[in-house]
């Protein structure tokens, strides 16, 4: 039996703090070829999740600690939905349909979510990054993160 414990979250958050990406994950599925992928993702508040979509695959997430703002976008980077997700928010989790551009914005420093999505996982095809969202290493990331933090439904982040 695989157990989800406070020490698991503590370990994930310690790894996130030490990671250049400021996040870490723990897979519950055994291998990348499993038909259902299940994982916990821990993030610090300064972690940048580049806007992306999963072609032909749905995604379900529930925030179990902290809080995130989750934004969805149209093809050109206009915000179509913005929700606060977390144990103390009005929304605990959500399911995204396939092919939906989305981004996570951590709003609490020690935040953890559980994600379930269709497998198998293929690093080449798992996610398509939004062309209007800067790559993680780009110098534009800090300004883009500020834009995400303030973006309202109907506004463009591109």
Where are the model-predicted features located?
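Glycine- and acidic-residue-biased ligand/ion/polar-headgroup-sensing regions
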Residues: 56-76
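A short, N-terminal "cap"/entry segment at the start of jelly-roll beta-barrel domains
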Residues: 1-36, 81-87, 138-158
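Structural motif
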Residues: 47-48, 67-69, 110-112, 120
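Double-stranded beta-helix
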Residues: 78, 103-158
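Short beta-strand His + acidic residue motifs that chelate non-heme Fe in jelly-roll/DSBH
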Residues: 51, 70-72, 94-96, 102-107, ...
């Amino acid at each position: 039996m695989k157990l989800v414990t406070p020490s698991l979250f503590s370990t994930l958050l310690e790894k996130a703090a030490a990671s250049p990406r400021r996040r870490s994950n723990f897979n519950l599925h055994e291998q990348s070829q499993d038909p259902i992928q299940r994982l916990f993702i821990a993030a610090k508040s300064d972690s940048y999740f580049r806007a992306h979509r999963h072609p032909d695959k749905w995604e379900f997430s529930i925030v179990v600690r902290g809080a995130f703002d989750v934004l969805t976008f149209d093809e050109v980077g206009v915000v179509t939905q913005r929700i606060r997700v977390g144990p103390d928010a009005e929304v605990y989790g959500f399911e995204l349909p396939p092919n939906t551009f989305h981004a996570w914005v951590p709003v609490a420093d020690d935040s953890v979510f559980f994600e379930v999505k269709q497998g198998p996982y293929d690093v080449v095809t798992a996610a398509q990054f939004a062309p209007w969202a800067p790559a993680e290493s780009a110098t534009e990331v800090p300004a883009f993160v500020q834009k995400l933090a303030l973006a309202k439904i109907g506004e463009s982040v591109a």
